[in-house]
């Protein structure tokens, strides 16, 4: 079954609800520019109340340092890395999720990070733009990938149709930035479960 990551969690209440509804893991954004920003210590606090894996999402900063200092089970780096950075964190590959833009110009980068054994999240190249689902579908046929980029209850089936290993949902399950909508969260979980039984 496709796994579900609810990202942009900014309250203990939403974290507990995500686990209760059936999310497989939850994400926390520690980039200060984000409206969903939380401090690293908050992740450690939440981990005392939930059992599902936690993911820290970073955009800037030294990647090795960020991995060493994270309070989460996994760390997601939401930028394209240099070859030097990839080599630097290769030993942590099972703990790291790398963002790959859904664009033809990143085909070589995609194959590099896959060949190195990293977990991959395919997302839109530019924030707010649509994901290239045709490209992602081709990648998903060959490799196990995660997919994100504006997933909501209304377009969930479009993303599930590429057969990803997992989906990353954030703004599509919000009442407003930083606050989740329980009904939308439930619709995503139910949609994924129904999809499993129709395949």
UniProtKB/Swiss-Prot annotation:
What's a Gene Ontology MF term here? phosphoribosylanthranilate isomerase activity
Hey, which pathway is this one from?
A: Amino-acid biosynthesis; L-tryptophan biosynthesis; L-tryptophan from chorismate: step 3/5
Catalytic activity as recorded in UniProt: N-(5-phospho-beta-D-ribosyl)anthranilate = 1-(2-carboxyphenylamino)-1-deoxy-D-ribulose 5-phosphate
Arranged from A to Z, the UniProt key words for this protein are: Amino-acid biosynthesis, Aromatic amino acid biosynthesis, Isomerase, Tryptophan biosynthesis
Which example biological process does GO assign this protein?
Answer: L-tryptophan biosynthetic process
Q: Does Mitochondrion count among this protein's keywords?
A: no
Q: Which Pfam families match?
A: PRAI
This entry's Enzyme Commission designation comes to 5.3.1.24
Give the family this protein belongs to, as stated in its UniProt record: Belongs to the TrpF family.
PANTHER family assigned: N-(5'-PHOSPHORIBOSYL)ANTHRANILATE ISOMERASE
This chain's protein is named: N-(5'-phosphoribosyl)anthranilate isomerase
Q: Give the originating organism.
A: Sulfolobus acidocaldarius (strain ATCC 33909 / DSM 639 / JCM 8929 / NBRC 15157 / NCIMB 11770)
Q: Its gene?
A: trpF
């Amino acid at each position: 079954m496709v796994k579900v990551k609810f990202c942009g969690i900014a309250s203990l209440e939403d974290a507990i609800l995500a686990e209760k509804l059936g999310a497989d893991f939850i994400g926390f954004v520690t980039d200060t520019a984000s409206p969903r920003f939380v401090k690293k210590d908050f992740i450690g606090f939440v981990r005392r109340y939930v059992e599902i894996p936690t993911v820290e999402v970073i955009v800037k900063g030294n990647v090795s340092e960020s991995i060493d200092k994270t309070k989460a089970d996994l760390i997601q780096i939401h930028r394209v890395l240099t070859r030097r950075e990839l080599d630097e964190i290769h030993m942590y590959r099972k703990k790291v999720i790398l963002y790959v833009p859904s664009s033809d110009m990143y085909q070589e980068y995609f194959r590099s990070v896959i060949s190195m054994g990293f977990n991959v999240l395919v997302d839109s190249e530019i924030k707010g733009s649509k994901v290239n689902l045709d490209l992602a579908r081709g990648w998903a046929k060959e490799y196990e990938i995660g997919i994100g980029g504006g997933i909501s209850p209304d377009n969930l089936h479009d993303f599930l149709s590429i057969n990803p290993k997992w989906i990353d949902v954030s703004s599509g399950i919000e009442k407003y930035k930083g606050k989740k909508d329980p009904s939308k969260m439930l619709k995503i979980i139910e949609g994924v479960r129904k999809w499993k039984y129709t395949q």
